[in-house]
């Protein structure tokens, strides 16, 4: 489904299916409702080739056709290679227990290397002796490599032994502060861009009034800046510094809560205008996409994107944080553990709108506790941000540190436009990300006899409760 979508196209993917016609012990009749396992590709009109795995020359011919198709049309193509599994699913599996009829045939079936050697000998390409020699050399090479591996102790592996692999070694996690402040000039340049609309561009009146004009007034007044403005400042400043930004998710262009509006629409012509693409001719690329409704597929794609483009700020946003459960496999198998398993770090950012705002049980919790349970050995960062400026700094810190770690952010909902949750100019130009913030409402710390550690929306709820109770010692 993603193959022809803007923001998710690859220019065509060649899908190779090594079809053993069995899954552990499950036969096709129990595994799917379609005739072929590749029938799902029909939904995007991808050509599908079914080829006999016992005929390597035809497999090569089909592969060449598939490659030429992909290069010419930039679309997906599928090759379904019909094969069989000679042994069990693993070293301890005995397939005769569940498919005795099938494996009684396979047991006496000649090896492909034998039948193919006879085929090329009949064609006069190689003699039988030459074919046997090629096979012997290959087996000798494999045995030598296997013997070498057995000699090495896994516990004594050195970084040099990963040379040529995809492993990436990086510095350990550090709590050292990172300079993420920007100059007033940079802030003004980004603010000017996101509050400027081209002449004769007919912005929807309500958007002009509540977004463009309002942001313009906030900028002229010198703040305070809300969540959406702070995010735009983070994106824009990174773009000016040479860092590309990619944001992908359900309704991400507007923002589920209409707080972002990264794309303006002409109500007459339906033309689109991207303010963050028009800050400076020298800026880097800004990409923002509304995604299809498969969290699993899209987060997987964006995670891969973050691996291929490590210098990019790559963000996946859930429509509501609850929906991350649809992508739990990507989170568990890759985001939380890929660095430990394969030395493959990622700086993917996940924005998960979180908070009980009266929208029902499926739109309230990003399951903060799940992500905290997955944290171990500095594998990722989980942040419940309290102020727009801290959101600004944590996004910029993601790029400016000397290592990569996934960043999980519990995004707010009610705080997006809250006057209480707004930041001053100096919070962007003379500050950094702080893991602990002072309570700015406390005038005399000596009178405090109780300290509560909290974050995010909880802080504002507690401040409100403290004011109502006229309590000054907490």
Mark where each language-model region is.
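Hydrophobic/aromatic ligand-binding patch that stacks against planar heteroaromatic rings
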Residues: 5, 40, 69, 237, ...
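Ligand-binding clefts of soluble mixed alpha/beta catalytic domains
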Residues: 5-9, 20-22, 70
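Short, solvent-exposed loop/turn segments at the edges of secondary structure
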Residues: 10-11, 36, 43-44, 72-74, ...
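Interdomain boundary/hinge elements
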Residues: 13-14, 351
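Short hydrophobic alpha-helical runs that function as membrane-insertion/retention elements
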Residues: 14-15, 41, 47-52, 383, ...
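Conserved phosphate-handling catalytic cores of large alpha/beta enzymes
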Residues: 25-34, 40-78, 82-88, 96
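Flexible, glycine-rich loop/tail regions that form catalytic "lids" or insertion modules at the edges
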Residues: 77, 83-474
């Amino acid at each position: 489904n993603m193959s022809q979508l803007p923001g998710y196209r690859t220019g065509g993917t060649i899908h190779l299916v090594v079809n053993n016609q069995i899954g552990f012990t499950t036969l096709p009749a129990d595994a799917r409702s379609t005739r072929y396992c590749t029938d799902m590709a029909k939904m995007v009109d991808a050509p599908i080739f079914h080829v006999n795995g016992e005929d390597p020359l035809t497999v090569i011919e089909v592969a060449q056709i598939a490659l030429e198709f992909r290069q010419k049309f930039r679309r997906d193509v599928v090759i379904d290679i019909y094969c069989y599994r000679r042994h069990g699913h693993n070293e301890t599996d005995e397939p005769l227990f569940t498919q005795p009829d099938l494996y009684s045939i396979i047991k006496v079936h000649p090896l492909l290397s034998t039948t193919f050697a006879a085929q090329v000998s009949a064609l006069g390409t190689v003699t039988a002796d030459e074919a046997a020699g090629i096979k012997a050399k290959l087996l000798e090479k494999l045995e030598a490599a296997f013997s070498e591996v057995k000699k090495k102790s896994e516990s004594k592996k050195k970084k040099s032994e990963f040379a040529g692999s995809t492993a990436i070694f990086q510095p350990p996690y550090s709590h050292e502060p990172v300079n993420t402040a920007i100059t007033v000039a940079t802030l003004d340049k980004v603010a000017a861009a996101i509050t400027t609309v081209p002449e004769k561009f007919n912005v929807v009146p309500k958007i002009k009034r509540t977004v463009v004009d309002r942001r313009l007034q906030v900028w002229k007044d010198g703040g305070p800046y809300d969540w959406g403005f702070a995010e735009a400042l983070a994106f824009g400043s990174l773009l000016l510094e040479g860092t590309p930004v990619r944001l992908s998710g359900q309704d991400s262009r507007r923002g589920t809560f209409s707080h972002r509006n990264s794309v303006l629409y002409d109500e007459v012509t339906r033309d689109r205008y991207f303010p963050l693409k028009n800050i400076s001719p020298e800026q880097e690329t800004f990409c923002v996409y509304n995604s299809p409704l498969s969290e699993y597929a899209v987060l997987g794609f964006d995670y891969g994107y973050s691996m291929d483009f490590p210098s990019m700020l790559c963000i996946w946003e859930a429509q509501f944080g609850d929906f991350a459960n649809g992508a739990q496999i990507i989170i568990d198998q890759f985001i939380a553990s890929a660095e430990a398993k394969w030395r493959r770090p990622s700086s993917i950012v996940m924005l998960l709108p979180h908070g009980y705002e009266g929208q029902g049980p499926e739109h309230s919790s990003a399951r903060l506790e799940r992500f905290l349970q997955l944290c171990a050995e500095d594998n990722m960062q989980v942040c419940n941000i309290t102020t727009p400026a801290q959101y600004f700094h944590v996004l910029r810190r993601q790029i400016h540190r000397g290592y990569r770690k996934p960043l999980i952010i519990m995004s707010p909902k009610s705080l997006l436009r809250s006057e209480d949750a707004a930041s001053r100019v100096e919070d962007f130009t003379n500050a950094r990300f702080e893991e602990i913030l002072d309570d700015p409402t406390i005038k005399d710390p000596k009178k405090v006899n109780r300290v509560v550690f909290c974050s995010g929306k909880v802080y504002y709820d507690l401040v409100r409760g403290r004011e109502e109770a006229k309590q000054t010692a907490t």
